[in-house]
Amino acid sequence: MVSRLFLAGAVFSVAIFFVATEVLSENGERLLLFVGAASKPPTEEAVKLFEKKTGVRVEVVFGGSGYILSQMILAKKGDIYFPGSSDYMEKAKREGYVYPETERIVVYLVPAINVQKGNPKHIKGLEDLAHPGIKVAIANPEGVCVGAYAVEIIEKNFTKKQKKDFKKNIVNYTESCAKTLTVVSLKQVDAVIGWSVFQHWNPETVETIPLKSDEVVRVGYIPIAVSTFTKNKVLAEQFVDFILSEEVRSIFKEYQYFSSEQEAFAWIGQKPVGGEYAVPAEWTTGK
């Protein structure tokens, strides 16, 4: 778990941030970010703010956390890895693609059911997703963090028959968190297993049905770290500091991300935080 001592020092780090990057931006400095789509709306706002304040050009690749990690590895470039959960950050650290000492926790996430606004199918809980006639989507658990969380929840709570019925109801394995939200927002499915914050990405078309506390295995968090492919570690670290600034934290707050473990626990109950989950082979081979 990342020490909160860093957060206490973030104000000082951000204080020197703008002076340092003014010089760098004059030389045409750029940053390339590989970002899990679990933070897409607030990250887009934060990037624009960073560019406006510093003049530094920031390019962002959004997608499923596993997929963008693969892209970063194949490209052998990138300054920041900013996945949607700890699962893929642990892999990136283990395989040497980020500097472990630069990892910080940005916000926390809780899995939930997301349905069309008004809940026309009257979905009340997890078991309803296995009922006949319900169209469901989950993110692809092979490369999208929220898909792995969905599988973890199904494996914990469903009987063999319920799991079989649930799989029959799946009409789409989406490629990112953003696309998971889109399929329910466009009424292509009745429900998804996503994040509680999805409702606040698009409140006009989506609402959240909380899972029961005992159905949720763990609370997730969104980490950020400097990539070992970076050519400008100093600037990359300054971007990390900026993301942890109060100004950016307030942007995440507007979208109802949880800023602490305690906030997440107040919503769902106390749970293990972070970690990794090995998706069973039956979910990754032919599904």
Question: What label would you give each PLM region?
Answer:
Residues 1-5:
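Positively charged n-region of N-terminal signal peptides that target proteins for export
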Residues 8-19:
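Bacterial N-terminal signal peptides
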Residues 20-61, 66-76, 85-86, 90-95, ...:
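Exported/periplasmic ABC-transporter solute-binding proteins
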Residues 95-102:
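A short, gly/pro- and small-residue-rich
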